[in-house]
Amino acid sequence: FLPFLGISQSGKVMDNLSVVSKILGMERKYAVYLPPDYYTSERSYPVLYLLHGAGDDHTGWVQFGEVLQITDKAIADGKSTPMIIIMPDADTKVRGYFNSPDNAWKYEDFFFDELIPEVEKKFRIKASKRFRAVAGLSMGGGGSFMYALHRPDMFSAACPLSAYTGPLSMEAFKAQLANRSMAGTEAQLEAY
């Protein structure tokens, strides 16, 4: 008599992928989590865009957030549907998920116009609002909050965790920009 040996499938994480951005004029890295049945099925999956906090990069959720173990367990326990998770880098060259007020740095444009179309073509992602969510921590929480506000047509759910949403006054905003060596005209700052 041999005892039953339960062997569960594991998802896969690739943390050194990249997309060439014409908008940013550089290559941007990202990580992806693929569910356990990705390579044994032909189905398409919902997607979660998972944004890291300040001082981290696209590998943060992989290394410190244990995205592979936590997501595999949630799927195995029936608490989550199998999904693809995309974790983009927002800490190389300029930190943040937004366009700069003077539009010299257009990360938000890159995210919506280049990253999303690229990964939704590369992986079997259900490319519609109904199957797309965004979440993030701290700086990434701010990104997920603002992306949901700026583009409600894109996401069915948003989960900003301890979201940093920026300064509370125009004076504090200008001081923050000065500390980051960024600038903008009064009209650009007001519009931003």
Predicted segments — roles?
Residues 1-11:
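Bacterial Sec-dependent N-terminal signal peptides
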Residues 9-192:
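Non-catalytic cap/lid and distal C-terminal segments of serine-dependent acyl enzymes
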